[in-house]
Amino acid sequence: MALSKDELKLEENYLENTSKEISNQIDVLGKEIHVKKEKLTEFRKVLWEDKGSIDASEMQTGLMSSEFEASFMLIKMDYYRKLLKIEYSPYFGRVDFTENGCDLRKVYIGLTNVEKDLDYIVYDWRSPIASLFYDYGIGKAKYEAPEGEINGDISLRRQYKIENNKLVRVFDNDLNVVDECLQEVLSEKSSDK
């Protein structure tokens, strides 16, 4: 089904805003990683230079603190790499889901999650809510969340092909059918692991 001009404009705006947020997060995270890396390197250097003047327990505490910071930085670096992967194609699917007794939620699905102001603007394709896209067409649907089964209705199921932050193809699909385009995206990304 073809999108109206108004719907297409809304989708283009969402893509533009999502792309800006991803670019912003890449910039902020890149700078943060660089600064933390320098501080961690300097801390370790000072720790080893002063090893003769500090006792074993202080050395152990310093090393443990250093390892904790390094682990935290690795997590940030992993997310940074994921953001770089999706920078020009942030999502490939969407479902509009109304949980029983709640407002409609537009769930955009991509290769990793993207948050803005404590809300997800893109959900990771492996998240529980993303199963709505894979397991259901239009109509009654449910997914298993940490707090239990969530029931509701899907009113829209949309697929996208995005290249260089431009909508190449957008179409609504009311059936639970994974198309060739989606299979291609998933197989490319899973082989990148």
Task: Go through each PLM region and give its residues.
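Extended, charged low-complexity regulatory segments
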Residues: M1-D192
